[in-house]
Curated annotation (Swiss-Prot):
Gene behind the chain: nhr-71
Residue ranges, compositional bias (Polar residues): 106-124, 171-186
Domain NR LBD per the UniProt entry, residue ranges: 189-452
Record's function text: Orphan nuclear receptor.
Alphabetical keyword list: DNA-binding, Metal-binding, Nucleus, Receptor, Transcription, Transcription regulation, Zinc, Zinc-finger
Protein name, as recorded: Nuclear hormone receptor family member nhr-71
MF terms in GO: DNA-binding transcription factor activity; RNA polymerase II cis-regulatory region sequence-specific DNA binding; zinc ion binding
Disulphide bridges, residue numbers: none
Zinc fingers (NR C4-type), renumbered ranges: 11-31, 47-71
DNA-binding region per UniProt: 8-83
Residue ranges of the region described as Disordered: 82-124, 168-189
Any one Gene Ontology cellular component term annotated for this protein: nucleus
Pfam families found in the cross-reference section: Hormone_recep, zf-C4
Amino acid sequence: MMKDEYNSQECMVCSAPADGLHYGAISCRSCNAFFRRTVVEKAEYRCKHTNTCLIDPDGRCACRSCRFTKCIEAGMKIGAVQPRRDPTGSQKERRKRAGGVGEMMSMNNSPLERNGNSFSSDGPTSNSFIVDAIRTDYGFATPRRISTDYSNSPDRYRKYVKIELDDEPIPSTSSAPEKQSCQSSPNDDEQQEFNHLVYAFGEHQRMMQLSFSTFEQFLDEHSNGPKLRRMDPLDVSKLSAVELTGLLYWIEKQQPYGELPVEDRSSLLKRYSVRKLSLDHFYSASKHPEYCARGEFVMNNFTFVPADRTGFELPDDDPHQIQAKREHCRTFAPTFNRFWKNVIRPFVLMKVNDAEVVFLHIMLLWSVTNNEHVTEDTRKVMKQRRDWAMNRLFDWYNEHGTSDPPLRFGQMILLLGEIELICDMHCQDFQVAKLFEFCDMSKFWYETLCYAPCNTNVLKFDPNLLENLKRFTAISVMENNGGLRPFVKTEIKQDPVLYSSPEVIAPESCYNDYQTVDIPVDCNPHTEPVSMDPNLANIDPAVLVFNAHMLPSVMAPLPDDADYHRPQLYHTQSEEVMT
């Protein structure tokens, strides 16, 4: 029977259209590849059920044990499988040489952690300087092993996605010689888990997009492609609902997140939420280079934020409020400029794909920067997952023929650090915006998760940021209302507890009892400095922002307050001057 005559028959293993007679049985190309790899690699599988799993075109990857058993029952002969032919030398000897290099690398490079991302040792050899740098700094890649986390995960994890991993171009055993490959195809359960995540991420992004579409838009998109429109303030409500659902769906996919203690899950959810949304937005924007060139930020809901808008506009804002927000937005220019220059533009130039974004998501969720918020046992799990993600991405590069995988991998690590930093800067910006009532997120979930205290603790960035802003605001208000006289410099004794938070108080040995402060003097520029009322000398101007009832004690009276009695703030020059 000729090969073409088998096309009308079904595979005796999975019932898919047959490709020919392979190893003694009529089978499809996928089952042919699966059977051959299992025999060559001497793989052993174990069914998690009763060894009666259904093997069909949709579910043939669900249970490898039952699939291999059915191959044998269909008549495939193990003895008919030939070992890989290597024209450059013995495959066995080459593996020994590769193993020797790996052992030398593991002895010379101990695993280190840097910026929250750790590598193990033993990776592909290369003369590239970046590979050597990565190995030296991180200690690269461990040998693959079977993942007990994934193999023991509930069956519901497998049912969400259907992806065939065995459909690769393996030549038929009945015709042309085998195509040689220097790299064995990664096909263990760990790589399958990563491929499932990549597939699920694409489905997840598409489902979020469809949540914003009407059926008219859906039909028009298939005919004319997606149409983008300017973002409207009313879009925020719908966007928040869809993004919350997407966040919970995606984090549930991450193994073994569901098995962690509830306190650790809560902390990781809050820490990851702002990073997940930021990365999704960066990735969505990078898919539209023409909009990026104009400085227009494309969102996942088929809208874009124009260059002359901030994205914080509310439905009832008038033109003056919109202009004011635009002016205030300059405060956040460092953050905006950084993510445009250091994240979105590289995403566009590199044409970052779903697999790389999945890798970044995994690294952000299990980042070492989250260690202080979880238990010791969870920290160990997080390190394992970071190592797992790095190995999986490198295998994915090799499997898909990526040009210069070590260089590409190094670029992704650099992007990871930038995204972490930008998310921290964004959370600090939110604190400033909230202080000046620049935006109100209280009715959305963003403030509960994304801007939770574990994300908005800015003391490690600028301990005096909020304090300085409050002081500046209070003093500016008082100056504008005539409540303060011109300033001269003098020294008064201060209580450090009054001017600093407990976290930033210096040791007593380093504290200077006398510090330079501004003291108002009389309006006559030639008069000597006058002293302040001792009861008010140490009042923090920031207190006035939150205690409006104290303003009459420190501000000049208005014209209609002429008879209003208030305590004297300034004494005459004959009184004692504080120095």
